[in-house]
A protein has these predicted regions:
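Loop/turn elements at helix/coil->beta-strand transitions in domains of secreted/extracellular proteins
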Residues: 14-18, 50-54, 144
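Short, small-residue-biased leader/transition segments that mark boundaries at the very start
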Residues: 1-7
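Short amphipathic alpha-helix with an adjacent loop that forms part of the alpha/beta core around
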Residues: 8-14, 36
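Extracellular ligand-binding/catalytic regions of CAZymes and related secreted enzymes
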Residues: 11-12, 23, 71-86, 120-125, ...
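A glycine-rich, often tryptophan-bearing local segment used as a flexible ligand/cofactor-contacting loop or short
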Residues: 31-107, 112-114, 127-128
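Short catalytic/ligand-binding loop motif for oxyanion handling, primarily in non-cytosolic enzymes
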Residues: 28-29, 62-67, 137, 156-158
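The substrate-binding groove and active-site-proximal loops of carbohydrate-active enzymes
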Residues: 21-37, 152
Length: 233
């Protein structure tokens, strides 16, 4: 038989730092009609308001209901233009390229197909907009933080940007330089219980990086193409 959970939704979220909602509007991926359930929407709002993180990609919480397309528009700080808000003043287009999330972006962010007709609400930090369509934004909601990204096709650069978005939304920026490579083409994998860590060059070219371990310790490293180096902790 199907097992159901007796815990209230809010308690299911207690162990989480960040929720990620990815996909197109009205799909199983983003939730669809489930957003009409006030217990679900209020639990997630409460989670973020009390200090949790929320990252939405594509059309997160997308379901036309009660005058909104994004049911978490006030959490994310962005909304999708649906024709009903054409007469609203939309003036929040100033970009903030120095934001923590973008500090490793050494080239224009690739959003893939992205999404069109996304605009920022008042008080939202627009990180990237193209032709007055928001592609990435950051927003404080209560004690919590939300990030909107229009699309995240896989690449080493995008992995780094998403990682920074997760840390920022979790108020964990100070954890960035822990088992970390300054060069996003290189990864650090720590196996703390086994007392080992490795540094991996993910490319077919030599790479130079600064490796950060713990306590702010770091060292410079050169890696040949596809090289993996192992170290004791």
């Amino acid at each position: 038989g199907v097992q159901t959970c007796a815990l209230p939704i809010s308690h299911l979220l207690d162990s989480l730092d960040v929720i990620i909602n990815v996909g197109d509007a009205d799909t199983a991926h983003t939730g669809g009609i489930w957003w009409e359930d006030p217990e679900i929407s209020s639990a997630i709002r409460k989670f973020v308001w009390n200090g949790g993180g929320f990252i939405g990609v594509g059309e997160p919480s997308g379901h036309p209901y009660q005058g909104h397309i994004f049911q978490l528009a006030t959490v994310l700080g962005v909304e999708e233009e649906n024709g009903f808000t054409l007469n609203y003043d939309k003036y929040n287009w100033e970009e903030h390229p120095d934001h923590f999330i973008l500090q490793d972006a050494d080239q224009p962010v690739d959003f893939g197909e992205g999404k069109r007709n996304i605009y920022a609400l008042e008080g939202t930090e627009v990180l990237v907009q193209r032709n007055k369509e928001v592609q990435m934004a950051a927003h404080d909601f209560g004690k919590g933080r939300a990030v909107y990204i229009s699309g995240v096709p896989y690449s080493f650069a995008n992995s780094r940007t998403l990682y920074r978005a997760i840390l920022w939304s979790a108020h964990s920026e100070d954890e960035l330089h822990t088992w970390f490579s300054s060069n996003y083409n290189v990864e650090v994998h720590a196996y703390v219980k086994n007392g080992k860590y490795c540094v991996v060059n993910n490319t077919y070219e030599p790479q130079d990086t600064t490796v950060y371990t713990t306590d702010g310790s770091s060292f410079a490293l050169h890696l040949d193409a596809n090289e993996i180096k192992w170290y004791e902790i």
